Structure formats: structure tokens, C-alpha cells
Amino acid sequence: MLDIKGYLVLFFLWFISTILIRSIFKKPQRLRLPPGPPISIPLLGHAPYLRSLLHQALYKLSLRYGPLIHVMIGSKHVVVASSAETAKQILKTSEEAFCNRPLMIASESLTYGAADYFFIPYGTYWRFLKKLCMTELLSGKTLEHFVRIRESEVEAFLKRMMEISGNGNYEVVMRKELITHTNNIITRMIMGKKSNAENDEVARLRKVVREVGELLGAFNLGDVIGFMRPLDLQGFGKKNMETHHKVDAMMEKVLREHEEARAKEDADSDRKKDLFDILLNLIEADGADNKLTRESAKAFALDMFIAGTNGPASVLEWSLAELVRNPHVFKKAREEIESVVGKERLVKESDIPNLPYLQAVLKETLRLHPPTPIFAREAMRTCQVEGYDIPENSTILISTWAIGRDPNYWDDALEYKPERFLFSDDPGKSKIDVRGQYYQLLPFGSGRRSCPGASLALLVMQATLASLIQCFDWIVNDGKNHHVDMSEEGRVTVFLAKPLKCKPVPRFTPFAA
């Protein structure tokens, strides 16, 4: 039996626990929060409502409580916008209050203390990095410099499709090949190398970058329950640091190789320059008010590896799945390509502006299957949206997935109809851009912190998809193409739950075998 001291200890623990829990979960009485589920469980908040894929669970809650809802995830205030109007108010009308991204434990550990463009807090140095992205690293001139790399990788990808499918006799797991393809483009642009049997270094880097993506998408209790942050009950702290050290060692090795190569070359050197060369130029630049740090350069390269690989691969897999399920769309896209390009050469990036239906196909995929179904901001101060109070430091989630399926904006919202993006009186022109000006379609975000790599991603996806339409017929499920399972999986990037398996039957071979 317990003596009086034992009872006092239990009472003290109960008292402290009660005060702690109330201090964590009690909502400020004077705040008028957006509507949401009525029951918040201690320590968990509304997490039991979010057991399925997060974007799907939040969409279901929005159908019940409205386009702007409030939930507690642990002790964290989370506000979710699921309509174009609420997204516009957050990303444009009140943008200055929402210019930060939430800084998670993993992102802080893996990106050199948030030294990258994606997670760095809004301010002077962020504006400096933004300027570098737009004028140097991802400018139109820089993208044009790498056009031959992208085109040669498309050709190599098509040849590989023919080889591994036995000219259409065997199924190919498209996700694996698409990820390899997009990764090869990015690694050649960044460091002048690609993944192949002779280059284990790039293969190792790709594996580590995949680990980074998994850690960034993992649910860490310390991110949502403040007092658990230093406890690291799930062991993510150790995993984050181990992975960061591996990434840093590889990035540092590449930087040093570039420095050594630059030291040896003369003015007439014909060595092809890549993004690491541009980064080194910026690191070494004199007289700037801000200087690019070595850590920011490595963090930027890591951002490029992550965003430039899985996102485009996801969209391409979804596009193929929709095309094989909708043969009339596939037929129309191919006819457009042949009418513009002919039947004697491979479609190129320079042809894309003359292919409005192909552009519409990709837009329709991005509407229904955005690679990142939710993107996040953070409230830098307490403010109001739609008449509701948004507490300072709240996480703001913009559901691009829900907005793209909103019947208030899209007729037959769940049907795959690329024609919706063409002007009815001039089908030769495409309407509605995807770079953030139209709030009913936000696959790359909007505003100051929209994705700076949108133009590069579109170039890669459009040219690759056009070539796959031009060069192959696609057979799924022994010809039962309409039976493709369109279920979803994934946290940060959403893929098909069951990877798409196709037989690519060659139809047009525009290059030497």
C-alpha cells in the first residue's frame, strides 16, 4: 500500500500533468477560430480524424466544416484552406503575414539549419536567394544553357524503354524508370554526371537524397507536441544527423572536385559548366552585400535533387495512367504532335508552345494529381482570414488537391477533360497558367514563396510526355487499359498506390538504334 508520501507524489504528478495539458490544449477564449471538429483529445488533438492520407482526410473535413477549417495536431494550431478564395486571401491579400514556411525538426537538421531556399525564414537573406534563383540559377538563360542535356536524356530514356521492354514484349515499372530519368536530368544539370553502371557515386547520392525525402515526410511527434521535441522518442534526431552527414560529405566532395577542375583549367577550356560551377561563381563573388555561403549552395543543390526528381516523375506517371484510361485524349494529343512535328523527327522543347492540347493534358493532370497535394505556410503574427482569427505560429495548409477538385470552379470536376484548358473560340490557345496567377490551380504554389523551379519542371514534363505519346503505344493489363487502379499513396509527393506497369510498344523510332 502507498504511504502518505506516495500519495503526495501521485497528487503532485497529477496536478503538474493537469496544468501542463491545460496550458497546451486550452484555446485562447478571445480568438474566433475557423470551424472544425468539436472534440480535441489531450496530446493528440484532432489526429484521430486524420488517419487516412492527410490531404484526403482534410478534404473530407472541409466538406463538413467549410473551405477554411481549424484543427489541432498535437498542440499545434493548423488552419486548412480548401478553396480558391481562401487561398487567395492567404497567398495574396494577407501574404506578408504568411511568408514563412513551418520549420520542422527534419528540415532544420537536413538543410544546414534551414540555409536552403525552401525553408529559410523570410527576410533579407531569403530575398537575396530568391534573386539568385531568378537571375542566375533558374533563369531562362540558364535553362536554355542546359537544353541539350534535357533533350539527350529524353532520347536516352526512349532507347531504354525499347531495350528493357524487348520492343514492347515485356512490362515496365514506369515509376522506377521515370524517377531514374528525371534524376539523370537533374544530376547532369547540377554536377555534370548521371547515374549508370559506371557511376556508383551518383547512385549513392540518389539513395541518400531518397532518405532525405523520407525523413522530411515522416511524422515526428516533436514537431507537434512541444515538450516532446528534445526527447526524440522516435529516434528521428539521430537518423536526421546521420543522413545529413552523408549528404554533406557527398556535396562537399562534388564542390571540391569542381574547385580543383576550375583551378586547373585556362580561359580556353571547353569543360561544360553545370549548376555547381554557377554556385561556386556566386560563392567567390566579391563586393556583394550578401554572399552565398557554402552551406546555402549545398542546401540549394539538395533542394534541386529532391524537388526535381520525385515531383516530375509523379506527374508523368499520373499522366500516363490517365492517357491509357482515356484513349480519345491520347489519340488527340498524338494527332496534334504529328500535325506540328511531322513523322520524321522527335518532338522537342521548342515545339511545346505550338502544342496547346499537350499543355492542356499536363494541366489537367496537375489539377487532379498535383505532386504535392498540400503546401504549408506559417503565420508570422496573429491575423484574420475570412473573419476568423489565425494565431501566430499556426501552420497554414493550402490544399491544392481539394481546390483542383472544387465543383464551384470545375465542371465535371472529377473527369479528365483537358479541353477545359482551351479557349472554345480559339482552341489553338491554352488558357489558365499553372505558375500561381490563378488560385483555382496551384500545383507550384503562389506568391513570393512559390516554387522557383516551375519552369524547369514544366520543360522536363512536357518534353518527356510528348515523346512518350509520339513514340509508343501503351498496353496495360493485357489491353484492359481502363482498369488502371488510381488509388494514391505518399506523404510529401503523391504517387499511384500501385506503380503503373505498361508495355511500351514502339511506334516511331526517331533516332539511330
UniProtKB/Swiss-Prot annotation:
Its cofactor is heme. The chain crosses the membrane at residues 1-21. It is a single-pass membrane protein. The keyword Transmembrane applies. The keyword Cell membrane does not apply. One of its GO terms (molecular function) is iron ion binding. One of its GO terms (cellular component) is membrane. It is an enzyme of class 1 (oxidoreductase). Keywords: Heme, Iron, Membrane, Metal-binding, Monooxygenase, Oxidoreductase, Signal-anchor, Transmembrane, Transmembrane helix. It catalyses: beta-amyrin + reduced [NADPH--hemoprotein reductase] + O2 = 24-hydroxy-beta-amyrin + oxidized [NADPH--hemoprotein reductase] + H2O + H(+); sophoradiol + reduced [NADPH--hemoprotein reductase] + O2 = soyasapogenol B + oxidized [NADPH--hemoprotein reductase] + H2O + H(+). It is found in: Membrane. InterPro entries: Cyt_P450, Cyt_P450_CS, Cyt_P450_E_grp-I, Cyt_P450_sf. It comes from the Eukaryota. Its EC number is 1.14.14.134. Coiled coil: none annotated. Heme binds at residue 451. Heme-containing cytochrome P450 involved in the biosynthesis of soyasaponins. No activity with lupeol, butyrospermol, tirucalla-7,21-dien-3beta-ol, taraxasterol, psi-taraxasterol, bauerenol, alpha-amyrin and multiflorenol as substrates. Belongs to the cytochrome P450 family. This is Beta-amyrin 24-hydroxylase. The lineage of its organism: Eukaryota, Viridiplantae, Streptophyta, Embryophyta, Tracheophyta.
